[in-house]
Every structure is written in C-alpha cells, then in structure tokens.
Amino acid sequence: MCFSFGINSEAQNLNQVLWDDEPLSSSIDYNSLESLINNPNGDDFNFTISNKRRIKGFGINIFLDTYNIKKDFDLNTVPEFEFEITSKNGIVEPRNRYIKSDHGFYNFYVGQGINRFETDESYSTVILPIAFIHKNANCVHNGILIFSIEENNISNGILQISSETCAYLKFDLIAVLDMENQLIESLNKETHLSTLENEIKSFTNLYNQYDIEPGSFAELPYFFGNSDHVTISGLIDGSNHYSNNCFTRSGFYPLCNELLLPSYSLAKSIAGTITIALIQEKYKNITSESVSIIRECRAPSWVNVTLEDLSDMASGHYLKSKFDYDENSLVHAAFIFEALTHDEKIEIACNSFPKRKNPGKKFVYRTSDTYILGTGINEFIKERDMGDDYFNDVLIPFFDELELSSSIQYSLRTFDTKSQAYTGWGMYLIRDDLKKLSTFLQKVKINNDSLSFLHEALNPNKANSNVAIRSADIFYNNGFWSRRFDGYKFGCKDDVWIPFMSGFGGITFAFFPNQMSYYYFSDEYIYSWEDAVYAAHQIRPFC
C-alpha cells in the first residue's frame, strides 16, 4: 500500500487505522494531535515492543539527495526495532534511547513520549518521538511513532518522518507497522526526569516588551523567508527559556522538548574542550601532553604538537591553509565517511596532512585533528588509571551532575572493538540540554577559579585566540569559535567578543556578554545571527 503526502484538510480518524478498521489515506497532521496531549493519562504499563512483522503500508518522498544515497542504500524500508518502554503517570520512557538496527544506513532513536486515554474509549494512545540517525554521520530525521494500547493488546503503529536537521538528505516517510508487544510483569524502576513539561516562553513576549523586530531570534517563519530549513531556535536568559515551536512539513512537532538535535561540531566544544577542562582540574599538564602519546602519531613532525594545539586547530599539519580546504578535501571525506575502524581513521588523521608550520601558530580547521585529540585524551587517562574511555568515564558523569538527558549520553563511535568516540562530531541533544549547558557555561565564563581551559575558551581576546576567518572577525581557541564586534555598536568602550559553538549545515550556540545564550539549528548553510546579538543587547545592554 502506498500513501500520498501533505497535511489533510480533514483529519482522518487515526484510531480506525490503528485498529485496522480502515486504511491510512495520507500523512498525519501533527496539529491534530494537540487535543490528545491534553487528555487524561493512560494506564501504567511495561512492554517490549517491536516491528519485526510485516509493514502494512509505506510511502516515501525524497526531495533532496545530494550524494545519491538512495543508489547505495535502500531507503524504501523502515529500520527494525525492539525496545522496552515503561509508562508511568502518562510519561512513556524507553529503557534505551539508541537502538542499533540491521538497516544499511540508519539506526533508530526513541525519546520520552506520552500515554493518553482517548475520549470516551477504553484504550489509550501512545506518541513517541523517534528519529532515524545515520550510522556514520550526524544527520537526524525526526518523526513520531503512534500506537494504541487496550489492556495488554497493541494496535498497528504509524511511523512518520516529517522533518530533519540534514543538509544533504531530506524526505517525508510514513509507514503502517504490524506491531508486537510483550508484557513485562514488573515495572522498570529506573526513572528519569521528564522534560516534556519544561516551561518554554514565546519570543512574542520579548518583542512586545522591548520593541524588538519580529524574527530577530531566527524563529519561524522569519528565518530568511524559508522555515523549511530551520529546526529550532531559542534564547536562554537565566531561568527563562524562549523558543519557537518545532516546525515540520506536517505542522508543529507534538513533542518539541524531545525533538532530537544533532551536535555536529558542537561536539568539539563539548566532548573536546569540556573533557580537557575536567581532567585538567586534577592533571594540569594534559594540555601540554605531546600527540606522540598516540602510537600512530609518533612521526617526528608530530613530536612538538600538543593536545592543546589540536584543540586550537593549530597542529601545523595541513594540505592548504585556505579556509575549509582540508575539511572538504577528498582524503578528509574518506576519513569521515569511509574509514569505519579506529585504525583506518587514525591512519588518515596522522599521516595524510603534512607538516607546514610549527604548531600553535596557524589555524586550519579540520575535524580529523579533533579525532586525534579524543584518542590522545583516552591514552592520557589510561596512563593515570582514570579509565580507558573519556566519554564514558569523564564526560557522562559530568552530564549526570548537570542532570542532562539520556539523549546526550551517546556518541557515534568506530565500528570495531576499540569503539573510539568521534569527539569532533556525532553527539545528540534535546532542547533542555541546551538550557542546562548554557547555565553551566555562563557560570564558568565569569568564574576563573576552576576549569581554566574552558574559562579561557569562553573569554576570547587577541592574545589567546588565532584568526580563523579574518574577513568576518572570527577567531578560534580551545575548541570554541568567537566573533569580535566593534564596541561602539553597543556603546561599549572596548570591542565585544562573543564565544560560540558552531555545527555543520547551520548550527550556532552563542554566549553573550549579558549572560544570555542564543541557539539555532538549521540545515541551509546559513551562519548569520547578528540580529540576535543586537536584539539581546536591546533587552539587556552588553556593557
């Protein structure tokens, strides 16, 4: 059975589809699910669910495939899944969020969902946020899985993908799944904080209160007139979190707080910089550790390169110094997409980019250097009995202290027993993680008593930063970008430096001098957030 795409003008009764009383005629209008979300909580349960039986109906519309991925992989299928879910007080929590799949291209993600009784019915309906995530890249295709439960019986499932943060592959997909479930007698006692009801405020309040131009914070649909390429944007001001609804091609995403966001190169600042700062609290010399701690990087050209040089993108090794030449080179594409094992990745990273200058002087952006950094951090902590995997042994305990979500506690890794975390890309977040990271980073920014490596990254200046893009006054230091603005534009005596994280396709997470933080996730290669800078200054001056 094939389906058409486009929001229904008259919403179909999904319950008829879920219980096999009629076929699905077209895609789901997400806005039609809003009334269900406000219904009473469904009964508690603990199930294992799967889709290992036949697919009853399927439709896909691929409207962007830059690299012709459909030629090499079958995109006309749904990844098989099997996972345990627990429903308590209407909140549905998966035991594991990341599900490995036999699909050639995707793994499967499931987030925290809801369980609500249908009006005047004996069954409840479950909506789970799901995503297809690329096995060897950071793209995310977001959607929902919806099904009903009556006593211990499960209905069909409807899986729909209607949005993504992915610059080179975009599609709409819908499938009716023949679902199975198995009752687990005892409820899973593991509990997680719910992010579903975290309070989010509208940008409209800010615009009205401070007479700010609508659209200044890149919220939909103002972002350069094209909302299709913006996943989400937000402004964080202490306990206040302003954001937009999560736009999709099928209406607003019904569980916006649980929408999965890819880190791309935000991981360089999180997995790279924060990890070094945490280790440095105990071992001050980590930043000066030679890259030769790594067996594959013991060539004479690497001897004087330190872990800090790698974090600065200043190893002195490169093909050409032209911005993004190395990052977009064929050999680096092979490192990212074709090298699947650690041995393959580290071989390319250490031996494909010749020494051109002494380390510490010249900025040349290349993700493979951050992969070397992650490998070096692992070797450093092994020698000091701190563990053997920095992501699991250093970073995840830190995430737990901040009460970040389970979504951020995962990284893409090499396909071998080494299972090396990619470090420079391959993490995931939800909106609440951004708020908690903002609170932490803004505190470190103004406090120089600890985490000095991170504090320096958040306080850029001419002395500690290398020029990255001279024409745009953009600099780089310790895994963070920064942009210098003329102080007179804000009535400030000195220039204003704004540190930020940046990710492939159009992702920014910036930290303003007035203790506000701003973010947007998009995939149209737009890196422009000056309006947000001036609007934030209008709310609370930078100096």
Task: Give residue spans per PLM region.
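Low-complexity, highly charged intrinsically disordered N-terminal segments
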Residues: 175-227
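A short, well-structured edge-of-sheet supersecondary motif
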Residues: 210-255, 508-511, 517
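Active-site SXXK
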Residues: 262-286, 310, 373-377, 434-441
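Active-site helix/loop module of the DD-peptidase/beta-lactamase fold
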Residues: 13-37, 41, 45, 281-318, ...
